[in-house]
Design a protein with these regions (language model features):
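HAD-like aspartate-dependent phosphatase fold
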Residues: 1-91
């Protein structure tokens, strides 16, 4: 069974219309450790695939929804849940 890591596209894979610093090294490390990576985004998937090809990313599946069952979700807008008290402190 492959372990899955789901990564948001905008703000994580792509920042300011370029690959984020360190993204290639991170993806290689995930692959070498046996993880499958899936990109989730609300952006047009053809546009995402074009960006990935243009910048030489490995073949990565992209989807419009966060895949269920991932062992990690990497998203620039996420709030790490520790407790509701901690969550509401940020608002």
């Amino acid at each position: 069974v492959k372990r899955l890591i789901a990564i948001d596209f905008d703000g994580v894979i792509r920042i300011d219309d370029k690959p984020a610093g360190g993204v290639f090294e991170a993806l290689n490390k995930f692959k070498n450790k046996g993880y499958e990576v899936v990109i989730f985004t609300s952006r047009n998937l053809k546009e995402v695939r074009k960006f990935l090809r243009t910048y030489g990313f490995p073949n990565i599946r992209a989807t419009h929804s966060k895949p269920d069952g991932a062992c990690a979700y990497i998203d620039d807008r996420a709030i790490k849940f520790t407790s509701w008290r901690d969550v509401i402190k940020g608002f």
